[in-house]
Amino acid sequence: MSKGFLVSLEGPEGAGKTSVLEALLPILEEKGVEVLTTREPGGVLIGEKIREVILDPSHTQMDAKTELLLYIASRRQHLVEKVLPALEAGKLVIMDRFIDSSVAYQGFGRGLDIEAIDWLNQFATDGLKPDLTLYFDIEVEEGLARIAANSDREVNRLDLEGLDLHKKVRQGYLSLLDKEGNRIVKIDASLPLEQVVETTKAVLFDGMGLAK
């Protein structure tokens, strides 16, 4: 790779993004691809501290705009401190959530102004967008059932939200898919993990121009 390649993983709660990424890493390493994996919110010390504030289950009174601005602040710090240097070094950067999460969660989910969110994303990222976004789609009820069945997963504030919010979030992602289908690829996350990994691998390799 002569320059970096930015991939974002998106999807509703319980879509299994993390499991897919864990399965993909050894495959990419075998190909000799230098990979940086990271997440939002978080990824760097300041971002992880912001993550704690956002996801703390006791912070039930958090205002929607406060929530959005915290995500944006984490995004900026994460980008400057970790993501941009890796891209400049020619690495493949895979981010667990990025700009589309703000549109889906705070825009469609919380009902905040989409244009304002787009402006804040533009401001925080200086216009950077992923080269490829993998959207892992799953019915809301199935995703939440997966979370409930996973005893190892720590419950966060978003897990405590009602079904209505999560349905709006999924609708937001589907709207983004319609709008930016050249960048966003939908992957059926309800299938067995092995199939999801194979599909994801094929889409990623194709996007990066790697031999399968």
Swiss-Prot record:
Q: What class of enzyme is it?
A: transferase
Q: Which InterPro entries match?
A: P-loop_NTPase (IPR027417), Thymidylate_kin-like_dom (IPR039430), Thymidylate_kin_CS (IPR018095), Thymidylate_kinase (IPR018094)
Query: Per UniProt, where does ATP bind?
Result: 11-18
* GO cellular component assignments: cytosol
Keywords annotated in UniProt: ATP-binding, Kinase, Nucleotide biosynthesis, Nucleotide-binding, Transferase
Give GO terms for biological process: dTDP biosynthetic process; dTTP biosynthetic process; dUDP biosynthetic process
Catalyses which reaction(s) = dTMP + ATP = dTDP + ADP
Membrane-crossing ranges are none
Query: What is the name attached to this protein's record?
Result: Thymidylate kinase
Q: Which organism is it from?
A: Streptococcus pneumoniae serotype 4 (strain ATCC BAA-334 / TIGR4)
